[in-house]
Amino acid sequence: MKNLIFFFKLFIHRFQQNKIAVYSGYLTYTTLLSLVPLIMVVFSVFTLLPIFEQATAQLKELVYDNFAPSAGDMVQQYLEMFVDNSKKMGIISIIGLVVVAVMLISSIDNALNEIWHNTKKRSVILSFVVYLAVLIFAPIFAGASIAISSYIFSLEMFSQDGLFSFSHHLLKFIPFVLTWLLFALVYLIVPNTQVKFRHAAVGALFAGVFFTLGKQIFIWYITTFPSYQAIYGALATIPIMIVWIHLSWQVVLLGGQFASVLKDMEMIKAGELANPLTEDRE
């Protein structure tokens, strides 16, 4: 019980230190700028890999629903139009879009390193390679996960009359599992410091649960109290998406802080880190 109380106090202390609300606002702004380039890069990877053709549609649905719950169709329509327009640009412009997409990963890197209180910086070249690898391999990982799970559950033994007919209910958890794995990989790889897998996994579970619950609550609020539609009319999708992206980044950063505080507690118990709560009193 004492450990739980100490964890809660340390979590609140770090929340005040880390300026989560400020960083989530900064990441929201960066996301809005890099949204089209990011989606263009992600789905260009799938175009080069026909094996993921079936999984692409499912992944698109997952992406658009998470970017703007309750307005996914409208967001998808506009974003796909913007992406189609970007395909008509020259090579220099496309390189510029890729750089903008990389800037988003860089912003996430800076925010998470601040949460982990890490002052070590990667070299520019290494940073660019890491960011580009995340852009390329994250969609491949997501596509492979969807493709493999779809194949497994299409087997006869998993049919409604098969031996494992109950498994169809497990399909509902695939989006949550993918979200959890994505958060865990971000917390594990992006910070330029050693992060234990169990810390990243627990932090990702915290973020995944609140992200999923938050999305359902957000959808309920938007559909029950449609004040945005009444005020903004056809433009209501824009503020809805901005608010949701901001809330999403707060959840992602809080999950990272959860993992960071777990590491801090281990170091404090081992005598490798001074207790920041007693330091502040002094």
From Swiss-Prot:
GO CC terms of this entry: plasma membrane
A Pfam family: Virul_fac_BrkB
Locations listed in the record: Cell inner membrane
Keywords associated with the record: Cell inner membrane, Cell membrane, Membrane, Transmembrane, Transmembrane helix
Bilayer-spanning residue ranges: 32-52, 89-109, 124-144, 170-190, 202-222, 234-254
InterPro entries from the UniProt entry: UPF0761_bac, Virul_fac_BrkB
Topology class, membrane: Multi-pass membrane protein
Domain of life: Bacteria
Keyword hit for Transmembrane: yes
Protein family: Belongs to the UPF0761 family.
PANTHER family for this protein: INNER MEMBRANE PROTEIN YHJD, UPF0761 MEMBRANE PROTEIN YIHY
NCBIfam families per record: PRK01637.1 (NF002457), yihY_not_rbn (TIGR00765)
Protein name: UPF0761 membrane protein HAPS_1376
